[in-house]
Amino acid sequence: MGFTEKQEALVNSSSQLFKQNPSNYSVLFYTIILQKAPTAKAMFSFLKDSAGVVDSPKLGAHAEKVFGMVRDSAVQLRATGEVVLDGKDGSIHIQKGVLDPHFVVVKEALLKTIKEASGDKWSEELSAAWEVAYDGLATAIKAA
């Protein structure tokens, strides 16, 4: 079964909730990542020299890019059944040493952040839609 119109709509609508408070949700996202994988801090240029996760334009921009890429993945999965990226997105992850366990940590942080942003709109169906979209993105990044 392919990615459904309803799944795409769930990802799109909840990504808009993230955009309502990107500073707060960006800090939450990276805080969760670093709680699970403290060594990942060195992979993010905007975090590696900081004492902790502090809101900054670069942090916010990167978080918005990540969430936007997952949203775009949902659109691609619905339209074509696969996610296709330009080579840059995959190569930077290889260059930074991103491994499978890192993708798991980011997925968990992404889901927890969207759950927080969604509030009472959160559901297992919403979670599953984000999981499938993220998994499609992760697969494309690893293949790039």
Curated annotation (Swiss-Prot):
Subunit-structure text: Monomer.
Location (main, coarse): cytoplasm
Keywords, alphabetical: Cytoplasm, Heme, Iron, Metal-binding, Nitration, Nitrogen fixation, Nodulation, Nucleus, Oxygen transport, Phosphoprotein, Transport
GO cellular component, one term: nucleus
GO molecular function: heme binding; metal ion binding; oxygen binding; oxygen carrier activity
Species this chain originates from: Vicia faba (Broad bean)
Protein modification: Nitrated in effective nodules and particularly in hypoxic conditions; this mechanism may play a protective role in the symbiosis by buffering toxic peroxynitrite NO(2)(-). Nitration level decrease during nodule senescence.
Any Pfam family hit: Globin
Positions that bind O2: H62
Positions bearing Nitrated tyrosine: Y25, Y30, Y134
The protein's role, per its UniProt record: Leghemoglobin that reversibly binds oxygen O(2) through a pentacoordinated heme iron. In root nodules, facilitates the diffusion of oxygen to the bacteroids while preventing the bacterial nitrogenase from being inactivated by buffering dioxygen, nitric oxide and carbon monoxide, and promoting the formation of reactive oxygen species (ROS, e.g. H(2)O(2)). This role is essential for symbiotic nitrogen fixation (SNF).
Protein name: Leghemoglobin-1
Similarity comment: family membership: Belongs to the plant globin family.
PTM-bearing positions, type Phosphoserine: S45
Domain Globin per the UniProt entry, residue ranges: 2-144
Compartment list: Cytoplasm, Cytosol; Nucleus
Residues that, per the record, bind heme b: S45, K65, H93, K96
An example Gene Ontology biological process: response to abscisic acid
Tissue-by-tissue expression: Root nodules.
InterPro entries associated with the record: Globin (IPR000971), Globin-like_sf (IPR009050), Globin/Proto (IPR012292), Leghaemoglobin-like (IPR001032), Leghaemoglobin_Fe_BS (IPR019824)
